[in-house]
From Swiss-Prot:
One of its GO terms (molecular function) is riboflavin synthase activity. Homotrimer. The keyword Coiled coil does not apply. GO terms for biological process: protein homotrimerization; riboflavin biosynthetic process. Its EC number is 2.5.1.9. This is Riboflavin synthase. Pathway: Cofactor biosynthesis; riboflavin biosynthesis; riboflavin from 2-hydroxy-3-oxobutyl phosphate and 5-amino-6-(D-ribitylamino)uracil: step 2/2. Is inhibited by riboflavin. Product inhibition may be the major mechanism by which RS regulates its enzymatic activity in vivo. InterPro entries: ATP_synth_asu-like_sf (IPR023366), Lumazine-bd (IPR001783), Lumazine-bd_dom (IPR026017), Riboflavin_synthase-like_b-brl (IPR017938).
Length: 202
């Protein structure tokens, strides 16, 4: 599990096609000595498993992960190319601060940025969610976008908006996001459970 608090901006170094998937090498500021094979790292919100690391004693800082058919179909990974910057977060450990909300790294689909608007020291992004996910997005609720835990400020049909302060723009890839871009979206699990419960109470 994750918290939606981004701890590094990684960069895609290489993309190697596999049978029904891809192998991604991600450059990172994380110390590879602190990463174990099999560890989970959220890459722009997608929970991926580390399958390779630099040799011990190497000054290189990267890790490799594999993404398969479902991830390529549901997420933005299918469009990733060498040089792309991505949000990174390592998995939650016992005792870690819970700064955002519980994020599982199981992306539900892609949302499209409709508008980016400066508002004083912050930036408001309006996004369009897939129709099937719209019922789970509520004002003042939580949503994970490219792995970032954000609060929904307003909702209008399948469009919603979020506000990011300048610091958040600087420590995530959101500073580069613009209208027309697509981002990974994971709806709040509590919203999913509430909807499921309501369905059975009808």
């Amino acid at each position: 599990m994750f918290t939606g608090i981004i701890t590094d901006i990684g960069k895609v170094d290489r993309v190697k096609p596999l049978n029904e998937g891809v192998l991604l090498r991600i450059e990172t500021a994380y110390d590879p000595e602190t990463i174990e094979l099999g560890a989970s790292i959220a890459c722009s919100g997608v929970c991926l498993t580390v399958v390779a690391l630099p040799e011990k004693g190497s000054n290189a800082r990267w890790f490799e992960v594999e993404a398969w058919e479902e991830a390529l179909r549901l997420t933005t990974i299918s469009s990733w190319q060498s040089g792309r910057k991505i949000n990174l977060e390592r998995s939650l450990k016992l005792g870690d601060e819970m700064g955002g909300h519980l994020v599982f790294g199981h992306v539900d689909g892609q949302a499209e940025i409709v508008e980016r608007k400066d508002e004083g020291d912050a930036v408001r992004f309006t996004l369009r969610a897939p129709e099937e996910l719209a019922p789970f997005i509520a004002q003042k609720g939580s949503v994970a976008l490219d792995g970032t835990s954000l609060t929904v400020n307003g909702v209008n049909a399948n469009e919603f908006d979020v506000l990011l302060i300048r610091h958040s723009l600087e420590v995530t890839t959101w500073g580069e996001r613009k209208a027309g871009d697509k981002v990974n979206i994971e709806i709040d699990q509590l919203a999913r459970y509430a909807a499921r419960l309501a369905q059975y109470q009808k």
